[in-house]
Amino acid sequence: MARLIKGIDTKLVHAGEPEPLIGGAVSMPIFQSSTFEYAGQTSYHDLRYIRMSNTPNHAVLHAKLAALENAEAAIVAGSGMAAISAALVTVLGGGGHLIAQDCVYGGTHDLFVEEFPRLGMTVDFIDGDEPATWREAIRPNTKAIYVEAISNPLMQVSDLQAAVDFAAENGLVSIIDNTFASPINFRPAEIGFDLSIHSGTKYLNGHTDIVAGAVIGRAELVERITHTQTHLGGILDPHACFLLHRGMKTLAVRVRHQNESALKIARWLEQHRAVSRVNYPGLEGHPNHLRACELFDGFGGMLSFELEGGLDAAERFVERVTIPINAPSLGGVETLIARPANTSHLGMSAAERARAGISDGLVRLSVGLESSDDLIEDFETALAID
């Protein structure tokens, strides 16, 4: 009898798992083999070889990721940037033009402005809150629109449904980076996005021990992206596949805890006299709060804030806290703290960061699984020193 797999918690544990179990192993084994015996395949891309991303470890992940977002297909990659690169090279091709949200992850921004020109591709940035202005950015060679579910690092929520509708009206591919939300809080295919991209390094894995990426969406597009990735080589090795697969099984438990803790911490920061601004879509005063409520099942574990003392106060705060680790990245079990100006968005010039609203004193917090009460007490102590 087929196993009943409906809810997302059940999908995390059972979707895509081999039936029958391989050798009876309850935990998916690692297939640490670069190649597999020829079995009569007639297509190059069907040959069983790690670079084709078609080992048993890859296949389980692809099926599980597609099931989580109620999408048609998925492919894992060697990093989040490998996933973004393979997707955009495929969709834009030679000479394609992209319309992108103006506040994005620093690595994505650098790809757009530094590498795109070398590949004959171009980008124009748009205000994600102003759909009426997007048409001005369209060119004859525009191929896609790119947004983030929750922007990094200002936690903005663009008009995502408008992005989907705009793409459909203009024959574009709609692409979203869903890393900050995760499939627990948002499933882009359900509102019509063609492609959803993740840095699997973050929430999907959740244990800060691998680098990985994923593209989820329409089967025809994912197949093309898979072929591109095969040629570019940005694949995920079987051991990393195993760690990603293991981490995903606890995704719901982790993300729901992080949702709850981040909201509690954001509300506390919002009331503190030393804090001038808190960016978290779960706060009623956030400009995109109502939109986030309509779209998401939770508001995520990421927030950012500014202190009254600006850069100096931010540097002192980051040095004084004792629980958060001062490091880039996010989505793990440990709370991480960083200033985007000298980590995730260091590749942007000061002028570019200023235009994006990213001050040098902005502090970004990735809330982990520690006690939220302990974190708040730690923050209170660090702020009280001044």
What are these regions (language model features)?
Residues 35-85, 107-115:
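Conserved N-terminal alpha-helix of the aminotransferase class I/II PLP-enzyme fold
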Residues 263-331, 348-354:
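Conserved small-domain helix->loop->beta segment predominantly found in fold-type I
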Residues 30-31, 39-60, 67, 336-361:
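Glycine-rich phosphate/pyrophosphate-binding loop
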Residues 113, 122-123, 136, 140, ...:
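PLP-dependent enzyme catalytic core of the Aspartate aminotransferase-like
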